[in-house]
Amino acid sequence: MKQLKKLKLDFGDPYIDDMSKRIVFLDIETSLITAKVFRTGNQVINANQLKDSTKILTVAYGSLRDLNNKGVKGVKCLTNRTSKTFKRDPHDDTELLKKLWPILDEADVVVAHNAAFDKGWLLGRYLELGMKLPSHFFVFCTYQNLRPFNMTSKKLDELSQKLIGTKKLSTDFSLWDRCSEGDVDAFKEMEAYNVGDVYDTLYQVWLRTAYYNPVKAIDFANPDSDLIQCKVDGQYLEELIGKYYTNRNTGKKYQLYANPRSGQIYRDRYMITSKSAGCGYVVPRSF
């Protein structure tokens, strides 16, 4: 049984190289919120008991191109620690969000783990601040990409340990508490933790799992190419001579293709008698 290797893109291809500049891997860290309560233990805390609201502490990000070419040095981190209002309010994320805005605005794809969390908080903060939203971008979630697969845990830290043998930096509640107090050293620790989340875990998990769910994959196939391509890696597919997919209901046949690098099977979108068959319109077979 052959091992399925991690995704390897051809950055010598001008189309993939150009596309990779607009694919952003991103992870955010949010602040603690303070609540007024009468006792300890499990309890329901209502909104009117809150003293403040959730803010963004740090955002680590890097383009696919930079992560491939520079490794962990391709990750940049925006932080409240460098804002002009830090001493007065270490939770003030206005300056951070202004710096992040053009990154999101220019992105075609944003990759995150449990991406609804990151996207939701960022867009929510822009709304609260009355700022214009960035241009629409496609969100690729490394958590949702694994929905067809049952695993003991799909937390990013567990996935990185199980699949690629790396581990997130160890942290606990006290780090967030110290950040709330404006502790400069705590913010530096948070920044290092956040940067590690992007390259050592998020990016590596994406490379490791990209081939497993081609239906939901980021599409690297060049629409102007004459080749029949795999959408996952943007490289050629081989025609499986004499092998077809037959629709059980209609009896129509469709040519099959294979990715020799991953073993993935594709079928033509058009039946073999169609004039459009063999023109490059293919769809991956899924589980």
Question: What is each stretch, according to the model?
Answer:
Residues 234-241, 265-266, 283:
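Cys/His-rich microdomains that often coordinate metals
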Residues 2-9, 212-220, 279-287:
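Short, intrinsically disordered terminal segments enriched in charged and Pro/Gly residues
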Residues 112, 158-224:
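Acidic, Mg2+-coordinating catalytic module of metal-dependent nucleases/exonucleases
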Residues 227-233, 247, 259-262, 274:
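Short cysteine-rich clusters marking metal-coordination/redox-active sites
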Residues 255-287:
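Short metal-binding segments enriched for Cys and/or His
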Residues 70-158, 162:
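Conserved DEDDh/DEDDy metal-dependent 3′-5′ exonuclease domain
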Residues 243-257:
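Short linker/helix segments within small regulatory modules
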Residues 2-104:
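Conserved RNase H-like, two-metal-ion catalytic cores of nucleic-acid enzymes
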